[in-house]
Amino acid sequence: MKNGARANIHLAVDTGMSRIGMTPNEASADEAARISRLPGICIEGMFTHFARADEADKAFYEAQYKKYREFCEMLCSRGVDIPIRHCSNSAGIVEGLDSNGLDMVRAGISIYGLYPSDEVARDRVKLVPAMELKSFITYIKTIGPGTAVSYGGTFVADRPMRVATIPVGYGDGYLRSLSNKGAVLIRGKRAEILGRICMDQFMADVTDIPEAEEGDQGTLIGRDGEECITVEELAALSGGFHYEIICQIGKRVPRVYLRDGKAIGKKDYFNDIYEGFGYM
């Protein structure tokens, strides 16, 4: 206020998430009206968050949306204008739940081209996965029967095997719970993970990919030829949630941004590289 600045704010309304926001009642409406009259404050918008819009049964969503609309009416009756009204998360967007009367949406998991759940109407919106995770083979060695691989010896070879090392681990956000379960795509074929995933590396079986060699690309998430490893597959194998898989990928992993299959930018936090973002 001393600098003559104005804060544009959005009010949060708790309609059923029990996370943040005003309870939608008369007392809260009075409080919002008082806030709207404060100097240096402009109520630019108001939002709520759907807790169960990704479920087939929309009853809870409908109850939340009704509370939100009623609270908007309470504010309007007190002379409070709400220019931007927004509720929908990715599930709401895919389902087209509140396309009438609102001004904005807040996409989350759908930005990555992923559906929020198996219960949303996927035929309404065609999403294409936008993220891949790739690395390469740094080393290949042959081991004999009885040889243990990685910490704890949880995998022991029962035959001669070719073992490839990939420089990605749980320090990069590649879940340790994928140990002895996950796979990496090499030359369009699946190479199963052997033993425990380390902090910075893991090992994979390339015995049946004789053409594999050091320097070959390894796809941890994404497509290689006819094979594909999805985020949902990794979530199922790890006993987790596909949102977690996306969020776990750490800053040590360089980001390369593509448009029409061509690299247009790169972020490499480790080497302090930020290229190609002048257009943003």
Enumerate the predicted regions with their spans:
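C-terminal accessory subdomain/extension
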Residues: 142-280
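Active-site loop/helix belt of alpha/beta enzymes
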Residues: 1-8, 14-136, 143-144, 266
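Bulky hydrophobic/aromatic packing residues
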Residues: 10-12, 25, 221, 233-234
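Structural motif
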Residues: 8-10, 44-45, 83-85, 103-104, ...
